[in-house]
């Protein structure tokens, strides 16, 4: 199995995760989408020096991982490429903000270090929330919920087609990579001199495949918009989940939970 086939397998694993059964999976897609958006907004609203305040925001993703039955290690494995890029956002903060902000065990910690850690946690928490949304909601249901929320149909169509076509492109890349290695056995990767023709062939194959897909869509009744499957109505448990989640986020945002718990333990 080459790298492209492994990537295709990981894409299918996301669909398998979304097809599982759990209380989180059974919630209305709109409730999960809105709660995720609220979580991300409130998470990024923390001050760059409020490291102690943002740590309790980890409680919500951890709780959802436990209820949904999705292992936390699966999340970090799927995000292994994106996580280093997100965590590198504040990597240079310690060099620009060197003023001491607090003392930790007799060691002065600069504001740049604190802001770097805060930015890293913000990125990690937001990625975890986004992964949970995708891992517990099928893409078709998510797109149907977006249309229910009056998101422009063109944007929803682009999202769905992009998600689906990534798998198609990965499949084409897997076939081309296998063909290349059969013609160049024992060679690691694709030689620099072959990249021009390789990318040209990929472009031609993707254009042909896109024409075939579009013709198939027209034969199945596609006319500028998709006919999404009906999703169940928004029920009381969905509303309670959404309301409870937002109230929980506001509690973590407005109340210094770390200081409150610290005061209880000190007593």
Stretches found by the model and what they are:
Residues 21, 25, 69-74, 103, ...:
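Membrane-helix interfacial "entry" motifs
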Residues 1-51, 56-66, 171-267:
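Transmembrane alpha-helix interface motif
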Residues 78-185:
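Juxtamembrane/interface alpha-helical elements of multi-pass membrane proteins
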Residues 50, 71-72, 152-154:
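Membrane-helix interface segments
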Residues 53, 71-79:
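Interfacial helix-loop-helix linkers and transmembrane-helix boundary segments
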Residues 47, 68-69, 96-97, 138, ...:
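Short helix-capping/hinge motifs at transmembrane helix termini and TM-loop junctions
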């Amino acid at each position: 199995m080459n790298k492209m086939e492994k990537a295709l397998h990981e894409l299918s694993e996301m669909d398998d995760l979304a097809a599982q059964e759990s209380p989180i999976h059974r919630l209305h897609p709109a409730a999960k989408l809105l709660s995720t958006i609220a979580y991300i907004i409130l998470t990024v609203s923390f001050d760059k020096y409020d490291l102690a305040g943002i740590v309790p925001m980890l409680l919500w993703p951890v709780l959802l991982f436990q209820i949904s039955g999705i292992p936390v290690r699966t999340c970090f494995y799927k995000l292994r490429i994106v996580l280093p890029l997100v965590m590198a956002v504040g990597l240079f903060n310690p060099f620009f903000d060197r003023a001491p902000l607090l003392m930790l065990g007799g060691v002065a910690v600069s504001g740049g270090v604190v802001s770097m850690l805060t930015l890293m946690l913000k990125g990690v928490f937001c990625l975890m929330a986004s992964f949970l949304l995708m891992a517990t909601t099928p893409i078709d249901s998510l797109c149907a919920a977006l249309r229910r929320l009056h998101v422009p149909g063109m944007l929803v169509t682009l999202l769905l087609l992009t998600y689906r076509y990534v798998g198609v492109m990965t499949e084409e890349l897997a076939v081309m990579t296998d063909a290349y290695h059969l013609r160049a056995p024992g060679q690691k990767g694709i030689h620099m001199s072959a990249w021009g023709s390789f990318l040209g062939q990929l472009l031609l194959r993707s254009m042909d495949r896109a024409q075939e897909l579009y013709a198939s869509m027209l034969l199945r009744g596609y006319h500028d918009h998709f006919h999404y499957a009906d999703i169940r109505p928004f029920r009381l448990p969905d509303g309670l989940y959404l309301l409870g989640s937002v109230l929980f986020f506001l509690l973590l945002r407005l109340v210094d939970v770390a200081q409150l718990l610290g005061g209880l333990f000190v007593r």
